[in-house]
A protein has these predicted regions:
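Non-heme di-metal
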Residues: 1-172
Length: 172
């Protein structure tokens, strides 16, 4: 008998050998099921791919816009609206992640199905993003654009922190 839910022991099946999960998320489903499938027309393949990409890009845009709207709401004294925008942004980010998972390497050839490969790739990307944002901040400062300089320079520091954090994880 289960001590938590009180279900009788007769309802349980002893698991022997390697356990199999009934359902798992998979990486690169588009490539596995659509891309080279002779039963799907080229027109439908293009439609499916284009829609997966458009949805990924749309979800990513919504994340940025919703977080921007959250910042506006907080500044205007509407913290509950700001918090809702933040929640919605997180859900949109989850949607983007699922589209990225479906698309796999067809979205980004450097993105792989392994954590180690993704860490190595993103370390390089974060270091590059740090430099790119720093260069933009310097240009903005040179032109007296303090708001752009200050914001982007802070982002460059964030990218540097991300790069070091990912690098530390990769070295473990």
């Amino acid at each position: 008998r289960c001590p938590v839910c009180r279900v009788p022991a007769s309802k349980f099946v002893e698991q022997k050998g390697e356990q199999k999960l009934a359902a798992v998320h998979e990486y690169g489903v588009y490539a596995q099921t659509v891309k080279n499938n002779p039963d799907i027309s080229d027109e439908d393949k293009k439609f499916i791919f284009d829609q997966l990409m458009a949805n990924f890009n749309g979800e990513c845009s919504e994340v940025g816009m919703y977080l921007c709207m959250a910042r506006i709401a907080h500044r205007e004294g509407y913290p509950e609206i700001g918090l809702y925008w933040e929640k919605a942004a997180y859900e949109e980010a989850e949607h983007a992640a699922k589209f990225a998972e479906l698309l796999g390497e067809d979205l980004e050839p450097n993105m792989k199905a392994t954590t180690k490969d993704n860490l190595a790739w993103r370390v390089d990307c974060e270091f590059g993003a740090t430099q790119g944002k720093f260069d933009l901040a310097v240009c903005a400062k040179k032109n007296g654009l303090d708001a752009i300089h200050d914001t982007v320079h802070e982002m460059a520091r964030d990218e540097a922190r991300h790069g070091r954090g990912l690098e530390g994880l990769l070295k473990r």
